[in-house]
């Protein structure tokens, strides 16, 4: 019964996540958040009468006021390294009321959760589904009506800004409706858990891939379900998938990856060679050694999912002499060649090697999901932004120009990170169910990756250079790199223009005591590796670019591929139900199918990855307050004037959008994750 109950918890973020305090919080707490936003908005109106200023240029009264505000902020924004399930990682001890999500976010997220409920109910027997379908349909209709009211209120406030105050009463009524809707969503999940637990089974190995397709009841089956076994598609994941940050160019193969010249030529042709490919910059490697305890190699037994496996493979890719696109060459399913044989991509005529090769690719995809979710996604975006959010609130007064700039890029971050720690990472939570490693090892390894992430080395241009993939002449087809640099440079110019408004010289930077305190908190309490004192304007620009890019574009690039690329379990999964293949030959489709995860894992993947990748809240370049009527953040005419820094930034983003759309017409497949129109300003989901 417990096994089935957890299976059904995959319906929509798990029953407790919806019904209890973890995701939507209690109505009273939520109303308190709205009251706090109203207070903050009132203060903001007063602050807007005085342009932001550096502390050294404030008068005595202003300096005392700044100090008082920061003293009170430090009582609310409190560091801890003992947060449940992420111990050792600097986090907020609790989420302040003003950091809870607003009505706009709640409506969007609730809508996606209802979609997931409808999808799950569609897979139930008709007799059981009927009652839930009616309730879910009613919820969908009521949510749509609430969205329409919300949009109408915004339109009225936009057309008549002076009427915004009179609209607050109607907005308060909308809040009450939304709270009631959220309560109904939670009750529906509870009812499904109670009534349907005896109607769902986990399926078995004998039904092939049908059980994985069946979990897409009303949701669209991703295209990857029909292409994931294709070798070119497998290679394309490395440059345009959810984890485009591991592939690196190599001049020689590592000693523990003994691919022979003859094996290479079997794949790339008799007229090519390893030496020639290396010399012409055509060899590219994936090495998952960094996974550590996320790849225990041996069997791991779990109550809910049975036996699971994960490894730290090495995979070689190469470009042909025409550089048309990466091709997989060989895979070693672990770090030790003595225990893991080499799998070389077979020719079409080598049918006896086909399923062994597919099994080796599955081992790579298991490692890929582990690396992506725990390192690239959780550690290097969510948890990095957490540190900068806390430091900003604790050390930069609301009147500081950098606080005004950065705060919108942290909207929702503390809230969603607390949800990740409490819902995704506990024992028997989503990650424990979906991933092979023991949950304690997963928690510790993800935390270690966050603490080891070097801020300056993580900057996009530096990361590309360090991996030897920065030159388009060597690797022409790399959508993440090419589109990412467009967005990076647009943000960098915006940061430079903004800094120039408030910092007349490098001396202004070094004289800024609040900035110095911010740096100190990031280094000391935030434990951001590699961070160092800021001594001039150009360095400040690079730092701001990295902070903004991480919270917005980088998170978008690794988060929003999840629904289309990661919800179909056979294409990628963080655990295998069978060990890595021990021989390239003699394997069958049945052997490969044994590696597929339990249906429980497939359900969990659909629900969590569809949710996380389907909520788009806010947009890069659109700086608005979090409380109704979501007024503009900037009021300083030096920033907002026609042709000024903000308008130029928004114009550049439109140019980037047009360039990417043009590029997509010529690409193997459109890469849409870094379109500025699809990049939220903050990490809020």
UniProtKB/Swiss-Prot annotation:
EC number, as in UniProt: 1.13.11.12, 1.13.11.58, 1.13.11.77
Look up the signal peptide feature and give its range: 1-19
State its location(s).
Periplasm
Binding residues annotated for Fe cation, in chain numbering: 377, 382, 555, 559, 685
Needed cofactors, names only, are: Fe cation
What are the recorded Gene Ontology BP terms?
lipid oxidation
Temperature notes read: Optimum temperature is 25-30 degrees Celsius. Active up to 45 degrees Celsius, less active after 50 degrees Celsius and completely inactive at 70 degrees Celsius.
Q: How is the cofactor bound?
A: Binds 1 Fe cation per subunit.
SUPFAM superfamilies noted in UniProt: Lipoxigenase
Q: What class of enzyme is it?
A: oxidoreductase
Any one annotated GO CC term: periplasmic space
What keywords are annotated for this sequence in UniProt? Dioxygenase, Iron, Metal-binding, Oxidoreductase, Periplasm, Signal
Anything else known: In vitro, under anaerobic conditions, does not transform linoleate or oleate into the corresponding hydroxy derivative.
* Subunit-level organization: Monomer.
What job does this protein perform? In presence of oxygen, converts linoleate into (9S)-hydroperoxy-10,12-octadecenoate (9HPOD), which spontaneously decomposes to the corresponding 9-hydroxy-10,12-octadecenoate (9HOD), and into 13-hydroperoxy-9,11-octadecenoate (13HPOD) which spontaneously decomposes to the corresponding 13-hydroxy-9,11-octadecenoate (13HOD). Also active on linolenate. To a lesser extent, is also able to convert oleate into (10S)-hydroperoxy-8E-octadecenoate, which spontaneously decomposes to the corresponding 10-hydroxy-8E-octadecenoate. Is almost not active on arachidonate.
The identity of this protein, by name, is Linoleate 9/13-lipoxygenase
| Gene source species | Pseudomonas aeruginosa
């Amino acid at each position: 019964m417990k096994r089935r109950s957890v299976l059904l918890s995959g319906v929509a973020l798990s029953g407790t996540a919806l019904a209890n305090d973890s995701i939507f919080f209690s109505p009273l707490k939520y109303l308190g958040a709205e009251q706090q936003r109203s207070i903050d908005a009132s203060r903001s109106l007063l602050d807007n009468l005085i342009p932001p200023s550096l502390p050294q240029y404030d008068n005595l009264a202003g300096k005392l006021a700044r100090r008082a505000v920061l003293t009170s902020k430090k009582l609310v924004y409190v560091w801890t390294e003992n947060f449940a399930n992420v111990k050792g990682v600097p986090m907020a001890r609790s989420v302040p009321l003003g950091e809870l999500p607003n009505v706009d976010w709640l409506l969007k997220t609730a809508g996606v959760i209802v979609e997931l409920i409808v999808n799950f109910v569609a897979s139930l027997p008709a007799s059981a589904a009927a009652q839930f379908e009616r309730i879910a349909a009613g919820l969908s209709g009521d949510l749509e009506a609430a969205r329409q009211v919300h949009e109408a209120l915004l339109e009225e406030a936009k057309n008549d800004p002076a009427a915004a105050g009179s609209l607050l009463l109607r907005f308060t009524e909308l809040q009450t409706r939304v709270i009631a809707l959220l309560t109904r969503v939670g009750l529906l999940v509870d009812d499904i858990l109670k009534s349907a637990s005896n109607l769902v089974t986990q399926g078995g190995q004998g039904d092939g891939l049908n059980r994985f397709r069946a979990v897409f009841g009303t949701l669209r089956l991703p295209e990857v379900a029909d292409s994931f076994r294709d070798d070119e598609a497998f290679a394309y994941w490395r440059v345009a998938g959810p984890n485009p940050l591991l592939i690196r160019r190599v001049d020689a193969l590592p000693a523990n990856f003994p691919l022979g010249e003859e094996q290479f030529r079997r794949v790339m042709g008799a007229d090519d060679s390893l030496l020639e490919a290396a010399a012409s910059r055509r060899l590219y490697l994936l090495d998952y050694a960094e996974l550590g305890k996320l790849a225990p190699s041996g069997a791991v037994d779990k109550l809910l999912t049975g036996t699971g496996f994960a490894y730290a493979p090495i995979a070689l890719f190469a470009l042909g002499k025409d550089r048309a696109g990466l091709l997989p060459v060989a895979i070693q399913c672990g770090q030790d060649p003595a225990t893991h044989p080499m799998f070389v991509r077979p020719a079409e005529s080598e049918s006896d090697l086909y399923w062994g090769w597919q099994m080796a690719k599955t081992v790579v995809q298991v490692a890929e999901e582990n690396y992506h979710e725990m390192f690239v996604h959780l550690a290097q975006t969510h948890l990095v932004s957490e540190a900068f959010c806390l430091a900003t609130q604790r050390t930069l007064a609301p009147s500081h120009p950098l606080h005004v700039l950065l705060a919108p890029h942290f909207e929702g971050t503390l809230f969603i990170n607390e949800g990740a720690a409490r819902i995704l990472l506990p024992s028997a939570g989503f990650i424990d169910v979906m991933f092979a490693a023991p949950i304690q090892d997963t928690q510790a390894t993800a935390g270690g990756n966050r603490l080891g992430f070097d801020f300056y080395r993580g900057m996009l241009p530096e990361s590309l250079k360090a991996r030897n993939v920065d030159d388009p002449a060597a690797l022409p087809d790399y959508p993440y790199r090419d589109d990412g640099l467009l967005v990076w440079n647009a943000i960098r110019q915006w940061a430079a223009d903004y800094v120039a408004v408030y910092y007349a010289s490098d001396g202004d930077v070094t004289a800024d005591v609040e900035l110095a305190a911010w740096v100190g908190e990031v280094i000391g309490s935030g434990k951001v590796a590699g961070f160092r004192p800021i001594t001039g304007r150009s360095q400040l620009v690079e730092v701001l670019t990295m902070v903004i890019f991480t919270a917005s574009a980088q998170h978008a690039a690794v988060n929003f591929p999840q629904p289309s690329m990661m919800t179909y379990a056979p294409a990628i999964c963080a655990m295998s139900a069978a060990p890595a293949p021990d021989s390239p030959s003699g394997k069958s489709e049945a052997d490969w199918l044994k590696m597929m995860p339990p249906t429980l894992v497939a359900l969990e993947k659909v629900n969590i990855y569809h949710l996380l990748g389907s909520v788009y809240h806010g947009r890069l370049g659109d700086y608005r307050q979090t409380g109704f009527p979501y007024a503009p953040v900037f009021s300083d005419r030096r920033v907002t004037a026609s042709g000024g820094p903000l308008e130029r930034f928004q114009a550049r983003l439109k140019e980037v959008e047009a360039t990417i759309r043009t590029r997509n017409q010529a690409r193997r497949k459109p890469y849409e994750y870094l379109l500025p129109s699809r990049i939220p300003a903050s990490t809020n989901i």
